[in-house]
């Protein structure tokens, strides 16, 4: 009875009404929740949901804002109705509402209209006749309603074809009469409907083949509709109407009678074809309709085809261009749509071909013959597609197809060529390629495989690129070779296949030679390789080649392929393919070649195998060309057949027509002919061929010109005189032509360019002739060449490439002289200095040079010129001083060139260094002059060695080091002009060269004196570079110093005359060399350590005189533009003074000090100046300093008050002095004690203190008096600049310093909170410096991170962090610091007490070993928990709970008592600290200490769980969970009651907005689980839903938990009461959680008392919340709760409830009050 009573009293209709009303809520979350609940309810009581939806829908869209949602719910509810559950009257009302809404607007596709249509379709599944009647009513109504009604019928047909199709007659009877009045804008809807209806009929017929729905009436309607659509709509002016009509007609053609179809064809076909003319986007739709039409007309089983082929020609002619449209879509539109259109067109042609194969074949061939690109392209594509499918029908037509394809071979359209190429491949696969025509087709593929983008074949509007065409042809050619032979051949076409093989071989050999096929050589070679590989075991290839006279001879093939090897990086692995073919064709050549190639070809293929690796070698092209020339030369050598060599030469000579002059292959061809002529003994033949080479060469192209010159050089190796004769003829003919002379009068550019090219070519040819000519015969030729004025004529060239050629030629002449000297034919080069002037002239840039000349070319010219200068300087006679200076003036400036482009600049700089070394080696007559020459060069380089630009310093140091290396070899063992090491024929010994003329002179004439080297000046110049920022500069400069001292010690009696100990000097030099060895082997070594060792070694190697000279010259070094180098110079000076200062006289010390002071004045960098002052302090170490100490401190105080010390140029000198004092052993201790005493007896000034009137700095410090201010600055300086000595003094007073700074930090933060920031900044600076001084880097980071935070929590935490850091790093200091701070708790200043408490609360953690101090600290902390400052109270409490665990056991009861008292503190921050501390204490406290006050703690924690502070709530929940382990004795029962009272609160906060609260509740629930007797709680709390942050998972967990909780019926009452209280929580998400928890328990509870007591209360609350709450999350929870309660109600009475008229009317007036 109770259940029935409850069921009858459930206000289900009201709840459903609220849910329906919520469909118009502003929040999407609420709308979705309401929709989900209504779906659940609709599955149980769909009629109630429909009643409520019906109630709100009667007002329409004007009264309800989300009619789309209402219609969606209604559609689902109707779908949930069981058969017979609803009456047709009510469904009729719903249908009327839906139709009324649909027709109320002229819109046709709004969201609410679509949902209303869905409702009608759902109604139609139950009452199709009712739905159709409703629609039929409006079909005859206003014209605006009919389209929507027709669309609904179309949707119904698509969704339920089996019910719709039997009623098609009625639909057509209603729709047909109104078709004539349908407006154009609505006709697409009607046409689409007929399409859907036709599809439904086809589906019905497919599923139910026994009964046909197409009776005579239906056919009559369909025929009449078909006629209307065809005659009227298909010719409408509206494009959309025509498109939709054709789409519909395409579906209807299979339903109408054959008679009507035949009569309709004359109109229907043009209507479809008309679509192709307007918009290409409609091609797919039109083609699909056309395919349906063709199937119905041609392939019908009811009779013969309705269309003759003549009738189809217009159709087929229209379809052919569509293939091109598809090709266009591949670029500009959707690829899938284009591909579908293409396939539909092919299906149309296949349909026709199945009926009229021969006619279609003839039609397609005729279209090809028209040679109209779109038609031809389409026809070729169709032929390619249909040839395999209609092969048997078309087999007899093969000659016609071959002839037609042959006629298209000259077509220019790339698209047609591509289609024809594809067709050729298909024809080949079906054995169409036979006889001469087959060769034509193969040649066609080869020719188009050679097409390149540069051929300009892609005309405007072309859709196919040359690249695409080339790819298709290349693949097709390979397919003919590889794939087709693998196909299974029938007996019928086996002979045809053999003919195809005969066509390919040896016909493909003809494709190698012609120029037009050059781009296809790789593909051809690959095909030849495959053919040779497959046929190697059958017919001998040699016989087949010789059997055909049109095949090129072997010499022509060999010469062509060798030249084509030029590019190793060519596409398709051209070089490797050619080498493979040569290997297969080796039987065609002389016998010995085959064996040689077996070894050589694999090596060459291995070189070009990895092209990516090949690219890494910048000289790969030159290397590869040399390999080709060597390959050719050795091939010629092994043949030993002079006639064959002559024949090969003739073949090479004929190939010039195959290559353009600017093609690099032409240059290689020159060289090939040159190496071949080198092997020929017939001088007349050689003369004829070099004339031919020169005639064919285009010397205006640098590459061609260079190839010609190298070829002439190769010929000169065997025929020098013949080559020189040719060159003389060329020289004599330069400018002698009458035509040229006349032309030059009118065109200066013609004269210049033509002359430049000829002179450049001549110069190169002379140069390479000298290079390759025998050394024994070149002296006279070179003398004759130099002795004439021919070289001077070459200076007038202006093009950079021409200049480079002339320079290269001069360089080759010089190298020829050097090479001759290597073979023993030594002779001087006449007019060498004049030739140097020529090079310098060519190297300079002409002021009139045009902008067309690239700067890169100028740099390349200069690099070549430097190289040539080096060559000329290295030959006899010796270089004069004037020439030397002229060369250096013209070249040294290159050191200042920028780094980019590096590939050009780097070789240029290397050539310059080599030139300087060559100048040094070839200059001077004795030791002194050579040393002076060295110093002259080095001083010229000083500006670059000390340059501020990194790469200039590196270049300068490299140059210095290279020259020193050369100089050392020169002094010790002579030199070689070519730089050879060891004994060589051109080495010149100093002693041997001097013996003849200077045997009686002192050794100074043979060896330089050490003083001449000026080591002091040189050392201080290069020493800063040893500390350079560039590692390479450091390494090189160290080697420079090593070379200097190695040279000095290698000189005769160098050590004895210097006053140094010989053994110590060599030890120092050995140490320096060890450092250099380390630098070379280990780049990670500390640079400062390396520099120290270098300075130490040098200090021992310098003589007294050199030391003084270095100190006197140190100003420039200390002022070096590189900071690190300047620091190194200062360090070196300090080392020199410290170690060898006793050797300095008073005058020397004075001058050295003057140099250091001068440097310090010029140094603006503060740190560098401090280091300079440190160097001065090292000189004054033995002077008195006590008076200076007092005066500096007083002066500093005055400066602080009266000056802006932060803006003094170069920094504050007094601070630098502080640094200097702090670094003295005796002064540092006294200085620190004095500063600490001032800090302890002084206090910070108030905010009204200020500086003098002259103060202008905004960052001035505010301290009590001048002395205190100076002391703080001095203390900071002491910490920062004291070094090891200062650090020792600080360590001695560590605890005093920390205590004072900590207390002052509290005072400064107090001042900062009132707006006075400066004292805090000054103190933090000093504190930071202290951290750096004592090495507490972590403490320094803490200060830097949080030091300036003025919030109390931040600075209190800062002091705690500092205390913790000190405790870890320096535990021995903790006791003394704690004693100082414990006493400070009694100070009257609040901020100092807070600072002391903050520090002690952290220090106490590390004071367990100090029992007496611990007792004193605990007593003080307990006493001050009643301090006036809340901060002191909570910090004291925090300190108490942080004492070591060993000590805590003695004070646990006392600490817990303090916590219990502070849980009721009036300050919330103290309460929060108390809760946090309780958590900490419970980790180790015993039961005896906690159990007596367990319930008191629980009650207070429950009160704190409703705090607005999320941290407080989280900690309160966690603390209560932590107390659960103490509920073991008499307090267990009381604590369990506390748990049950708290459990609902834990559950609703389990999905709190704050993540910390969520985690705390999870942990606490797990701890409570053993006490509340939940079965299988481990499975519940270990589930994924319990730990998830997703709300859905939370709701799932609540459902699972509720299943366990409702089993204890006596507790459910308590849970429900507590949960309902949470309905009024201040947090919306907690309200939502409480709603869900309570409704879940109610839905699962079996206790009728609980249900009867709380069900109405909760339901009423949900209604109230739903209508009044402003929070969407609450309204969404209410919506879900309604669904949950109604879906799970134990009573089924409400499931039959309906919404009565009175209630619905009343509720309808209340809907406006619902929150939206």
UniProtKB/Swiss-Prot annotation:
Subcellular location field: Vacuole membrane
UniProt cross-references to Gene3D superfamilies, sorted A to Z: Leucine-rich Repeat Variant
Residue ranges of the TM segments: none
Pfam short name (any one): Cnd1
Effects seen without this gene: Abnormal inflorescence stems gravitropism but normal hypocotyl gravitropism. Impaired flexible and dynamic structure of vacuolar membrane (VMs) leading to altered amyloplast sedimentation.
Organism domain of life: Eukaryota
SUPFAM superfamilies: ARM repeat
UniProt entry keywords in alphabetical sequence: Membrane, Repeat, Vacuole
One GO term describing the cellular component: plant-type vacuole membrane
GO annotation, biological process: amyloplast organization; gravitropism; negative gravitropism
Tissues of expression: Expressed in roots (e.g. root cap of primary roots and vascular tissues), hypocotyls, cotyledons (including in guard cells), stems (e.g. epidermis, endodermis, phloem, developing metaxylem and interfascicular cells).
Chief subcellular location: membrane
InterPro entries: ARM-like (IPR011989), ARM-type_fold (IPR016024), Cnd1_C (IPR032682), HEAT_MROH2B-like (IPR055408), Maestro_heat-like_prot (IPR045206)
HEAT repeats: 10-47, 144-181, 220-258, 263-300, 317-354, 381-418, 499-537, 552-591, 626-663, 667-705, 737-774, 785-822, 830-868, 910-947, 1013-1050, 1089-1128, 1148-1185, 1230-1269, 1372-1409, 1412-1449, 1451-1487, 1492-1529, 1537-1574, 1592-1629, 1653-1691
Keyword Nucleotide-binding attached: no
Presence of keyword Repeat: yes
Function summary: Involved in inflorescence stems gravitropism, by modulating vacuolar membrane (VMs) dynamics in gravity-sensing cells (e.g. endodermal cells) during the amyloplast sedimentation process.
Record protein name field: Protein SHOOT GRAVITROPISM 6
